[in-house]
Amino acid sequence: MGGLVMQDVRIVRFDMLVRSGKLAKATAADEGMNMLTKPEKVFFHNTNLMYCLTPMTSVGTLRETYLASQLAVGHQLSMPEQGDLVADGKWLFEVGGKSKGFSQIKGIENSFVVSDNIEIGYDTKIPLWLFGLLY
């Protein structure tokens, strides 16, 4: 019985971190967004927190974390089979660097490449920094 209570406490504490804005979570695409749903992926809300725990964080992880933190404020995030993130079950995002192409999300409706180190977007390629304006 004690194990079940501890699990409930962990779930409530995790949910408090998500609601307080310290963490963002993305569930599997086919699951609902409730407190008891195990997240597929957990993101820090602030990329600076990542450096406190792991100074050698990969650039790709930082990019995904930044995008998730900006989208999580007004959208529900889920993990797709292809791509990196889905917002509100509708918009698919693939995150990468300047040379990131469309091959991983080719032919998927409402899909976008979010690229770091570009100033201006074109077609369905969006600069990563632009998502900072959503916040």
Question: What do these predicted regions represent?
Answer:
Residues 1-83:
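Accessory nucleic acid-recognition modules appended to NTPase machines
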Residues 71, 85-104:
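Conserved catalytic cores of phosphodiester-cleaving nucleases, focusing on short active-site segments
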Residues 89-92, 109-113:
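Hydrophobic beta-strand segments of well-ordered beta-sheets in folded domains
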